[in-house]
Amino acid sequence: METFVRLFKDSPQQRSNAWHATRRTQVGGSDLASILGLNPYKSYYITLAEKANLFKKNLNHAACSWGTLFERVSKDLLELFCQTTVIGDNIHIDGTYLGYPGHSNSPDGFCHLTLGYTQQSWEIKTIFNDVCYETTKRIPVLVEIKSPFNRKIKNSVPSYYMPQIQSGLALSPPISMGIYVEAMFRVCSIHQLGWNHETNTDIHPPESMLPLAWGIITICSTQEHTEAPQDFGTLNAEAFHQLLETLYQKNQYTIHYSMPYETACPEMSNVVGYFGWKVFIFQIIPVMKHPQFLKDKYPIIQQFLHDLHTLKTSPSPMEAYEKICCSKESLLSTEDIDDFTNMLT
């Protein structure tokens, strides 16, 4: 696994300008559900128009900021709960090296997990498992992390995330299993931190269970800031959403993360504010590699890239776009969609 990750040490770093530029010319793992017709929030045609710069992406900046903030926290918790180390969380895997030019994947990382065997089945060993296993084995896995702001967490992988995971597995030959990590975080004030269910109930519904862990996110200005830091965990829902929108302007702020279970704010300069977090659900769902996935779906990727090239080279891209939209039939059958549902186990 480590040798594989080192192959891509010089690839564009995730979320860098070079990475964004590369992504505009390729079908990334996170684009796949849309072009396969599996994403209920974005279609093939919207994705095509975005990559061709026919209109700007209609991003929910608050949701993007939330996901980015808590991706780092989720990795820290995964390392703690599974006694592992996540690597390769900044690499970009170009599919050209495996014969899939134009396709790429930017994984949330890779790590080793311990599987324990008991009662005729294998399970992922965590610090919460008080089990004496008959035998154990250590395996490398691909990591995919999601931290929804409001969506209810179920004990399964949403079908529209499965293509992203299978893409990562297909472009990572040494890896035969992925894990889908989904966590439910809640905001709280600094004074609410600790082993209790207290949270900011204006931002999220109240919780009755106790948290698995907690910590602090500190926001610092890149400019000199002398005002007293604010506890953002006391904001109302509207003001907190505005904060998340503001944090999307990444060049204005730096983010610092406490270790899990800390309750004291760190001493540092230019602190604008901070807020506490608690995690109440932390699911780790195994996903096995589907050997034929990319081979079967690559023709659709090629068709998308052909359409994208048509738009970018057309003297009248809007007319070309309308023609593509009017002429194209569904690219994915009902049977294909059912297959993805069956892949969830």
From Swiss-Prot:
<keyword id="KW-0945">Host-virus interaction</keyword>
<dbReference type="InterPro" id="IPR019080">
    <property type="entry name" value="YqaJ_viral_recombinase"/>
</dbReference>
<keyword id="KW-1035">Host cytoplasm</keyword>
<dbReference type="InterPro" id="IPR011335">
    <property type="entry name" value="Restrct_endonuc-II-like"/>
</dbReference>
<protein>
    <recommendedName>
        <fullName>Protein D345L</fullName>
    </recommendedName>
</protein>
<dbReference type="GO" id="GO:0085034">
    <property type="term" value="P:symbiont-mediated suppression of host NF-kappaB cascade"/>
</dbReference>
<comment type="similarity">
    <text>Belongs to the asfivirus D345L family.</text>
</comment>
<dbReference type="InterPro" id="IPR011604">
    <property type="entry name" value="PDDEXK-like_dom_sf"/>
</dbReference>
<dbReference type="InterPro" id="IPR051703">
    <property type="entry name" value="NF-kappa-B_Signaling_Reg"/>
</dbReference>
<comment type="subunit">
    <text>Interacts with IKKA/CHUK and IKBKB.</text>
</comment>
<dbReference type="GO" id="GO:0030430">
    <property type="term" value="C:host cell cytoplasm"/>
</dbReference>
<comment type="function">
    <text>Plays a role in the negative regulation of host NF-kappa-B signaling pathway. Mechanistically, recruits IKKA/CHUK and IKBKB to suppress their kinase activity towards NFKBIA.</text>
</comment>
<dbReference type="Pfam" id="PF09588">
    <property type="entry name" value="YqaJ"/>
</dbReference>
<keyword id="KW-1100">Inhibition of host NF-kappa-B by virus</keyword>
